[in-house]
Amino acid sequence: MVKTPITEAIAAADTQGRFLS
């Protein structure tokens, strides 16, 4: 998987979403 600002943002939002909920 290539790391790009877009994928990084999605991954960050995904981890935050799981952490918050």
From Swiss-Prot:
The answer to keyword Transport applying to this record is yes
Q: Which domain of life is it from?
A: Bacteria
One GO biological process this protein is involved in is: photosynthesis
* The record's account of how the chain is modified after translation: Contains one covalently linked bilin chromophore.
Topological relation to the membrane, as annotated: Peripheral membrane protein
Where does it reside?
Answer: Cellular thylakoid membrane
Alphabetic keyword roster: Antenna complex, Bile pigment, Chromophore, Electron transport, Membrane, Photosynthesis, Phycobilisome, Thylakoid, Transport
Cellular component, GO annotation: phycobilisome; plasma membrane-derived thylakoid membrane
Q: What is its main location?
A: membrane
User: What is its quaternary makeup?
Assistant: Heterodimer of an alpha and a beta subunit, which further assembles into trimers and the trimers into hexamers.
Name the protein family.
Answer: Belongs to the phycobiliprotein family.
Main role? Light-harvesting photosynthetic bile pigment-protein from the phycobiliprotein complex (phycobilisome, PBS). Phycocyanin is the major phycobiliprotein in the PBS rod.
Instruction: Quote the protein name from its UniProt record.
Output: C-phycocyanin alpha subunit
Question: What does UniProt list as this organism's lineage?
Answer: Bacteria, Bacillati, Cyanobacteriota, Cyanophyceae, Nostocales
Q: Which gene encodes it?
A: cpcA
